[in-house]
Amino acid sequence: VVWRLNAWRTLPAMCVAVGLLMCLPLWQKPRPDEWQVYMLDVGQGLAMVIARNGKAILYDTGLAWPEGDSGQQLIIPWLHWHNLEPEGVILSHEHLDHRGGLDSILHTWPMLWIRSPLNWEHHQPCVRGEAWQWQGLRFSAHWPLQGSNDKGNNHSCVVKIDDGTNSILLTGDIEAPAEQKMLSRYWQQMQATLLQVPHHGSNTSSSLPLIQRVNGKVALASASRYNAWRLPSSKVKHRYQQQGYKWLDTPHQGQITVNFSAQGWRISSLREQILPRWYHQWFGVPVDNG
């Protein structure tokens, strides 16, 4: 293999950039009015962290494989490095690419509370009508309906997190049939600043009515780079962009960070911070993933 000479010239600068980036948690202390949402780069799964005042809540825990899981390999070290103490987990649904890291996380922090729509032992309900406060943020569940015994994607717990000015809607793997049912009754409460794109950007989800009712500014999608399903779908990405959303996804941006404050919100991504030209030269960025 012959590497590009330009890439080698940037290697020292890249090493310095990585070193500085790794030190950021050591000197950056968020202000009390700030809170963060992180979409971690866990591959073909979903794991998000909501953080404020040194505490954290997880929304999904990534995937599992025969030799390990996202909790053990990524989420636990990441939380330790950022000096975040998790207090709870919201599990959208039972599929392994969303709950794969849960056991490892509970082994490290056995006192965590869990909310889910699964009716499993020791799980608090995450169903329509549930609402709670955490660190000054309001969490409200909008799907599934209470008493539903369905499973799978369309039983995903849809949660809105709101600071009174800005908000994010977390959707798990909800698909178009459930989106339609949810919007037919509760569309007035769906508006949010940011939206986690359902089901990794699959065309089975993100119906136009959902995109329009949320009326957000940014769509965030989690998927693996060059995945076999070609997600996120180019049709879905175009659908969001046609409605005025800025589109970001982990296959292209890596970890995505949203910082909310009294001044508004701003987004940064890991690959933008670690010399994107170097990254693109060596690994390439496809025009489209689906």
Task: Place the predicted regions along the sequence by residue.
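Non-globular, low-confidence helical/coil segments that flank catalytic cores
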Residues: V1-G290
